[in-house]
């Protein structure tokens, strides 16, 4: 192998002696002697050695170990076995081999799967990434013992391949006959096997360069290292990089498959923990005490400061980042603590921007889109291993985001089958797979933040929210909060938004060059290296508030302070650790408010309800109140936390969209009435007021509107009277003509006959006049027809619009 130096026996013994001197450090600090004694007492056979210690004691040997791993590791492991034998000879005989695992600083050999190139072959490297695939654990034969009944002899054979540290692999043929063709029987009790597993680690998604796919590398785990990692874990793997020749038909191709033979697997913290100093903790405590009254509002305002408005949505996202308290009850049931939020609304209301902010702020977040995600891609897939042909599990986005946040954009574009796949994850926090002979359960305890557009592209305010949303109740009830974000035309608000957006475009970060594109991620691939001499004094001081900038924050908000993003991350990280307990007062209040929500749900119409009020809503109230208490750094959930949670739920569940629409219509009616005052007499005004008085009780009714019911006087009826067309003005003028009861009754009968003959729900004015007067002895004049239609319109029996009569 290129770059490999084969040690002769003399050099091997010298290396073994050096490593033995390193381990026998009783005269020094006695670190490794105590570690070996612990290894014996714990019945282990792998010793973890810090490379930095070896480098300080014998730099030459440390460099050789990193650059010529196979021979040096063999010498190191022999030295370890000799050292164990010197302490406990009987224990050393229990195991055939003792293993050495490495940790510490690897310098240029600390790489990611992308930078793992051919120059690292036969070297010890430290690779970090995220586990995407795991094979099943299989036993692999190390030594087989065979008995020949004919000759009464026992044959022993050892096996080694390129996945071991032995330089020359042995034949892998399993003997069935001896030299004289006598059959052999395998003595399974005397044979030795080791556990064998293959995993694939992939470059971390946030560290992959822009425009390039994440790379991956196969890792071989043996003995005690198997099952150290599962799909979704972030790990550091220290091992030897080796290439395996691929033989096809007796020939070896010029390209080789490479693997990493692991000697140590270290779990990285699933949360990208910010480094804390003592000053940071003191600042967090001081901030929570000084701003105890309005701390929740202060933090919510500082979330996504580049987005104007959406105060309630920001409060909900802050609750999502903090989370509730998860509970595993004695009877085996699990109550989730993660908060799920769905944002539904018109285009261009900053839904996707809010998702992107969460991606940057949350300690662990995975982005996906509805169209680019399948059900198995979100949960877990069973794939076939190309080499062995066996089935294995591959983790999906929600498993990879365990204890984090999954942001799903364009949620409405997903197919129904894919959406149903995430039902179990959103409530139980796990993925259960029972496919192709594999039955597995993976943890996926993640919060879901989803954004979707309404069914019709834009939100139709004349349809119920359930019709606009178009998702199943079973899915909606799993979302704790559902926000309808509307793009409403309000001149004052539009002016504020335009001012805010223009300031954002004029703002330039310090040091930004002319014409330079802002980087989306970190330009440098930051790898986590353990530094034993790390001191926190080198840390930069974290500022609580951002420095005020007129362009960035606006001139009107000089008094408002924005919490800096760095401090926000640290504050959320500390606040998540707290587990507040419900007080009796808050528990009683939540129970009362829940029963009120249920009764409000049954009394009010469907138009006001955005998602079903179920028993999950009660858990939602508890989770939101707990998150609010976490924001205050409180150990108890008090009444103010419960009140804030109820306010959020009231806003999200019962957003009275149609009421706002009615106010706008009323305003437009008032404006049109002021114009009519100049043109019409006082008598017309009084009649209009009378008609509006008879109309007002109708608007208060909460039931849905049925266009085929004569007696129906529902809340959508104001829509009938809104347009001020020429026909409606003629109708008001024609009200001066009084019709007798008999004449009106005759008109109604004739009108119904005309509609019956036409087999239609609408008919034109000219056709109506012609049909009514065709067989009538006393024809109706146009003024009489207008007066009769006006009377029937007031009684909600017909609707006249642009010369067409609609039967209601």
UniProtKB/Swiss-Prot annotation:
Belongs to the MCM family. Keywords: Acetylation, ATP-binding, Cell cycle, Chromosome, DNA replication, DNA-binding, Glycoprotein, Helicase, Hydrolase, Nucleotide-binding, Nucleus, Phosphoprotein. It is found in: Nucleus; Chromosome. Residues 727-739 have a biased composition (Basic and acidic residues). The modification N-acetylalanine is found at residue 2. Acts as a component of the MCM2-7 complex (MCM complex) which is the replicative helicase essential for 'once per cell cycle' DNA replication initiation and elongation in eukaryotic cells. Core component of CDC45-MCM-GINS (CMG) helicase, the molecular machine that unwinds template DNA during replication, and around which the replisome is built. The modification Phosphotyrosine is found at residue 708. Residues 670-681, 704-717 have a biased composition (Acidic residues). A motif (Arginine finger) lies at residues 477-480. Its main location: nucleus. Early fractionation of eukaryotic MCM proteins yielded a variety of dimeric, trimeric and tetrameric complexes with unclear biological significance. The MCM2-7 hexamer is the proposed physiological active complex. GO terms for molecular function: ATP binding; ATP hydrolysis activity; DNA binding; helicase activity; single-stranded DNA binding. The gene is MCM3. SMART domains: AAA (SM00382), MCM (SM00350). ADP binds at residues 353, 393-395, 397. Component of the MCM2-7 complex. The complex forms a toroidal hexameric ring with the proposed subunit order MCM2-MCM6-MCM4-MCM7-MCM3-MCM5. Component of the CMG helicase complex, a hexameric ring of related MCM2-7 subunits stabilized by CDC45 and the tetrameric GINS complex. Associated with the replication-specific DNA polymerase alpha. Interacts with MCMBP. Interacts with ANKRD17. Interacts with MCM3AP isoform MCM3AP; this interaction leads to MCM3 acetylation. GO terms for cellular component: alpha DNA polymerase:primase complex; chromosome, telomeric region; CMG complex; MCM complex; membrane; nucleoplasm; nucleus; perinuclear region of cytoplasm. Residues 295-502 form the MCM domain. It catalyses: ATP + H2O = ADP + phosphate + H(+). It comes from the Eukaryota. The modification Phosphothreonine is found at residues 674, 713, 722, 725. The modification N6-acetyllysine is found at residues 293, 547. Changing residue 535 to A: 50% reduction in phosphorylation by ATM or ATR. This is DNA replication licensing factor MCM3.
């Amino acid at each position: 192998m290129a770059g490999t130096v084969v040690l002769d026996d003399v050099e091997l013994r010298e290396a073994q002696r050096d490593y033995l001197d390193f381990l026998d450090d009783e005269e020094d600090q006695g670190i490794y002697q105590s570690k070996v004694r612990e290894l014996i007492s714990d019945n282990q056979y792998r010793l973890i050695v810090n490379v930095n210690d070896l480098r300080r004691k014998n730099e030459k040997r440390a460099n050789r170990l990193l650059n010529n791993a196979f021979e040096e590791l063999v010498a190191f492991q022999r030295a370890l076995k000799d050292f164990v034998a010197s302490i406990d000879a009987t224990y050393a005989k229990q195991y055939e081999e003792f293993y050495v695992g490495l940790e510490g600083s690897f310098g240029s050999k600390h790489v990611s799967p992308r930078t793992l190139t051919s120059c690292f072959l036969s070297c010890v490297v430290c690779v970090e990434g995220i586990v995407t695939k795991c094979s099943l654990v299989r036993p692999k034969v190390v030594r087989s013992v065979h008995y020949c009944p004919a000759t009464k002899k026992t044959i022993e054979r050892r096996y080694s391949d390129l996945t071991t540290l032995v330089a020359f692999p042995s034949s892998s043929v399993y003997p069935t006959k001896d030299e004289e063709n006598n059959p052999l029987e395998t003595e399974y009790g005397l044979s030795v096997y080791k556990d064998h597993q293959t995993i694939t680690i992939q470059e971390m998604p946030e560290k992959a360069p822009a425009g390039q796919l994440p790379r991956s590398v196969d890792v071989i785990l043996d003995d005690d290292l198997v099952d150290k990692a599962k799909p979704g874990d972030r790990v550091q793997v220290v091992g030897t990089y080796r290439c395996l020749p691929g033989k096809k038909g007796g020939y070896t191709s010029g390209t080789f498959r490479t693997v990493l033979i692991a000697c140590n697997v270290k779990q990285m913290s699933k949360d990208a923990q910010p480094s804390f100093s003592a000053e940071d903790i003191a600042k967090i405590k001081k901030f929570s005490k000084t701003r105890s009254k309005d701390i929740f509002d202060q933090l919510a305002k500082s979330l996504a400061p580049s987005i104007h408005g959406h105060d309630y949505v920001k409060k909900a996202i802050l609750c999502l980042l903090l989370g509730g308290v998860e509970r595993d009850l004695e009877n085996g049931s699990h109550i989730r603590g993660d908060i799920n939020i769905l944002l539904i609304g018109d285009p261009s209301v900053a839904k996707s921007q809010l998702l992107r902010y969460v991606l940057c702020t949350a300690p662990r977040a995975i982005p996906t889109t509805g169209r680019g995600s399948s059900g198995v891609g979100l949960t877990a897939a069973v794939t076939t291993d190309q080499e062995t042909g066996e089935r294995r599990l591959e983790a999906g986005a929600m498993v990879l985001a365990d204890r984090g946040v999954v942001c799903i954009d364009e949620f409405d574009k997903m197919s129904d089958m894919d959406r149903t796949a995430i039902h179990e994850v959103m409530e139980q926090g796990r993925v259960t797979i029972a496919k192709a002979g594999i039955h597995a359960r993976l943890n996926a305890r993640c919060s879901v933040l989803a954004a979707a557009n309404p069914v019709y592209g834009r939100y139709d305010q004349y349809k119920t929210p359930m019709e606009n949303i178009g998702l199943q109740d079973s899915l909606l009830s799993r979302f704790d909060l559902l926000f309808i974000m509307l793009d409403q035309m309000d001149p004052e608000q539009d002016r504020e938004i335009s001012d805010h957006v223009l300031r954002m475009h004029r703002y330039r970060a310090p040091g930004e060059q002319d014409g330079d594109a802002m980087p989306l991620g970190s330009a440098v691939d930051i790898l986590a290296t353990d530094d034993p001499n790390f001191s926190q004094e080198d840390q930069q001081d974290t500022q609580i508030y951002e420095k005020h900038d007129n362009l960035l924050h606006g001139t009107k908000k000089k008094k408002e302070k924005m919490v800096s993003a760095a401090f926000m991350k640290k504050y959320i990280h500390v606040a998540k650790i707290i587990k507040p307990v419900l007080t009796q007062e808050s528990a009683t209040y939540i129970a009362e408010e829940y029963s009120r929500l249920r009764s409000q749900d049954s009394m009010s119409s469907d138009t006001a309800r955005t998602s079903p009020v179920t028993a999950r809503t009660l858990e939602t109230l508890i989770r939101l109140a707990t998150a609010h208490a976490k924001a205050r750094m409180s150990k108890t959930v008090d009444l103010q936390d419960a009140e804030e949670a109820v306010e959020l739920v009231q806003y999200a569940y019962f957003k009275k969209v149609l009421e706002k629409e009615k106010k706008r219509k009323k305003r437009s009616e008032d404006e049109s009435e002021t114009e009519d005052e100049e043109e019409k007499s006082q008598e017309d005004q009084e009649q209009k007021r009378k008609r509006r008085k008879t109309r007002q009780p109708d608007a208060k009714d909460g039931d849905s509107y049925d266009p085929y019911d004569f007696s129906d006087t529902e809340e959508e009826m104001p829509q009938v009277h809104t347009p001020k067309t020429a026909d409606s003005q003629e109708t008001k003028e024609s009200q001066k003509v009084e019709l007798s009861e008999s004449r009106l009754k005759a008109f109604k009968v004739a009108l119904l006959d005309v509609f019956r003959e036409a087999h239609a729900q609408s008919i034109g004015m000219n056709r109506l006049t012609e049909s009514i007067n065709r067989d009538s002895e006393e024809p109706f004049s146009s003024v009489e027809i207008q007066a009769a239609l006006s009377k029937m319109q007031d009684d909600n029996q017909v609707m006249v619009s642009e010369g067409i009569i609609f039967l209601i």
